[in-house]
Curated annotation (Swiss-Prot):
Domain of life: Bacteria
Gene name in the database record: rpsK
A biological-process GO annotation: translation
Protein name as catalogued: Small ribosomal subunit protein uS11
Subunit structure, as described in the record: Part of the 30S ribosomal subunit. Interacts with proteins S7 and S18. Binds to IF-3.
UniProt xrefs under SUPFAM superfamilies: Translational machinery components
The organism's taxonomic lineage, starting at the top: Bacteria, Bacillati, Bacillota, Bacilli, Lactobacillales
Length: 130
C-alpha cells in the first residue's frame, strides 16, 4: 500500500494595494461583491450565497450588506484604502452594499452605474402572476 500523497496547496499571496475598484453585481437572486486592483486583478470577493444565505434570503439587502462587509475587510487586510464603486444589476442589495463598504472604513472616491441596457435585445421574461 502506497502512502497518501500530500498535495501542496498554494498559499494565497497577500497583495499590497492602496486603491482599487469594488464591483457590486446585484441580481434578483444574489449579490456578489468583488474588489479588484486598478488593473482588474481580484483582491477580495464575497457573495450572499458564499456567506451561507440560502434561497430567497440571498436576495435581501441584509445579505448584500454582509457580503460587502466581508469583501471590504478582506481587502483592507491587504492594504486597500480607496475604492471606486461600480454597480451592476437591478437587485435589492445595491444601496446597502455601498453603505456597508463606506461603513467598514473604505473611502469611496466614485460611484458608477454600469448596468447593461439593451438596445431592444431579447424579449424579457413574462410578468409573474401570484
Amino acid at each position: 500500500m502506497m502512502p497518501a500523497k500530500k498535495t501542496a496547496r498554494k498559499r494565497r499571496v497577500k497583495k499590497h494595494v492602496e486603491s482599487g475598484v469594488a464591483h457590486i453585481h446585484s441580481t434578483f437572486n444574489n449579490t456578489l461583491v468583488m474588489i479588484t486592483d486598478v488593473q482588474g486583478n481580484a483582491v477580495a470577493w464575497s457573495s450572499a450565497g458564499a456567506l451561507g444565505f440560502k434561497g430567497s434570503r440571498k436576495s435581501t439587502p441584509f445579505a448584500a450588506q454582509m457580503a460587502a462587509e466581508a469583501a471590504a475587510k478582506s481587502a483592507m487586510d491587504q492594504g486597500m484604502k480607496h475604492v471606486e464603486v461600480s454597480v451592476k444589476g437591478p437587485g435589492a442589495g445595491r444601496e446597502s452594499a455601498i453603505r456597508s463598504l463606506q461603513a467598514t472604513g473604505l473611502e469611496i472616491t466614485a460611484i458608477r452605474d454600469v448596468t447593461p441596457v439593451p438596445h431592444n435585445g431579447s424579449r424579457p421574461p413574462k410578468r409573474r402572476r401570484v
